[in-house]
Amino acid sequence: MASIDDDDDERTPLLQDSHIGELVETQKQLKSRWWSIRVMYLTMFLSSVGFSIVMTSIWPYLQKVDQSADASFLGWVIASFSLGQMVASPLFGLWSNHRPRREPLVVSITILVAASCLYAYVHVPASHNKYYMLLARTFVGFGSGNVAVVRSYVAGATSLSERTGAMANISAFQAMGFILGPAFQAALSVIGETGITINGISLQVNMYTAPALMGALLGIGNIILIFAIFREHRVDDLEKNVSSINSESEVTDVEKANEGPIDQIAVISSNILFFVVLFVFAIFETISTPLTMDMYAWTRTQAVFYNGIILAAVGVESVIVFLTVKILCKKTGERVLLLGGLAVIWIGFFILLPWGNQMPKIQWTDLQNATIHNTTQWTSSIPSSGNHSVEPTGCPVIQTWCLYTPVIHLAQYLTSDILIGVGYPICNVMSYTLYSKIIGPKPQGLYMGWLTAAGSAARTLGPVFVSQIYTHLGTRWTFGIICAFVALSLLHLTAVYKRLIPFSTRYERL
């Protein structure tokens, strides 16, 4: 394996070590280790599916089971997944540090299965059904807190030379889960709203509940695979030894063997950078539908359909990028790619800044409704087209910025989508990979839990932030603030650049 020189540190992947010896591993251990890693890939995929498989149907399902639910409560239902995951991630991570990882994995997936079943039964209670849905989604998120355990296991079960590829694969499976979840929902929509009812257990299987039940069945299959195939392995940071860790005593032995403190500044900086990456991507996901409806006068149906196609294309693009970074990392390094990914994200949002003299089409509906008592006679003289429920389109006049802020052209929007679809997956993979190497041989469960919690907090706060800024201040302020936010992150990354090195490399330099 190639060695690295200090002078060539910038272009050498950080996954390499100058004093790496031969890896002591039998063929049986190698096979078991990689089959266990593949089970973790599947676990990550199913966790993502659990989030996305009901996303397109949550709003109509919520309205069906509880007519008192409004759009603001829908926001809480959507955010509850990330809140549950944010709370659970450090807890499961800490658990995995002191016990075999099979325990938190099985418990978390069991919670996810139970919560998915609860989601399918929220129609049963006589009242307060919306709160049962909120509870169900919270616990689905809580069960998905096992992603910290998954990433910490893969980080510990791979050598430095294997880790970037393994982390890229995890992110690719996560992205595929987000892409295929809505596809599963679309396929199951043929069941219809009525579906079938199993009276003995009060279960309604319809287009809203079938995806959740499918998620529960996949979770049960995941648990079976964990018991049948998953075995815990660990590769030390010098890649000289592979050990099995499948009992409490073996976990304790590993903890005692790892000496030396972790660079906490590098750890905190990595969490901050990861928060920024997830924060801006959550904003990107949230704003796509209202932005296109306001800028291009798309109807709700058009916005959902066209943005669904765009986001699916971005998802496919992201999977390709996830797989490509494994090759790029061998020629550059994680830090260089992270810096480049953030720069691409900044360009993507900068392109969205409005310019020119063309204004968006204005939706005057709100003004007309406010003065309808003065115009009843005038409107009654207009010939009827037979359609009494034409959906108003355009930028609502109640958003006063629509009157003086230039339109964002469709070419700007599509170019931004492409760039963000490149920058986000690069930053995602590099953040996890660098973070795992900074922690080194230490138990990574709790640390990965904090990183996952930072991402969950970002996915919770991002939509809240953008909904307020966009509605009241408009596109110029929204994307201007995001550009400033990403620019500050680039400066922060530059400041801590030399500290973002593997644990083993740091102690070689001391």
Swiss-Prot record:
Which gene is transcribed and translated to give this protein? mfsd8
* Extracellular topological segments: 60-72, 125-132, 193-209, 286-302, 357-406, 467-476
Keywords from UniProt, A to Z, are:
Glycoprotein, Lysosome, Membrane, Transmembrane, Transmembrane helix, Transport
Q: Which residues are glycosylated?
A: N369, N374
Q: Where is this motif: Dileucine internalization motif?
A: 14-15
Q: What's the protein here called?
A: Major facilitator superfamily domain-containing protein 8
GO BP term (any one): lysosome organization
What this chain does, per the entry, is described as: May be a carrier that transport small solutes by using chemiosmotic ion gradients.
One GO cellular component this record assigns the protein to is:
lysosomal membrane
Q: Which residues cross the membrane?
A: 39-59, 73-93, 104-124, 133-155, 172-192, 210-230, 265-285, 303-323, 336-356, 407-427, 446-466, 477-497
Top-rank taxon, per record: Eukaryota
Question: Which InterPro entries does the annotation name?
Answer: MFS (IPR011701), MFS_dom (IPR020846), MFS_Domain-Containing_Protein (IPR051068), MFS_trans_sf (IPR036259)
Q: According to its UniProt record, which protein family does this protein belong to?
A: Belongs to the major facilitator superfamily.
Q: Where is this protein chiefly located?
A: membrane
Show which residues sit on the Cytoplasmic side of the membrane. Answer: 1-38, 94-103, 156-171, 231-264, 324-335, 428-445, 498-510
| GO MF term set | chloride channel activity; iodide transmembrane transporter activity
UniProt topology in membrane: Multi-pass membrane protein
- List the taxonomic lineage: Eukaryota, Metazoa, Chordata, Craniata, Vertebrata
Please report any disulfide bonds recorded for this protein chain, giving both cysteine positions.
none
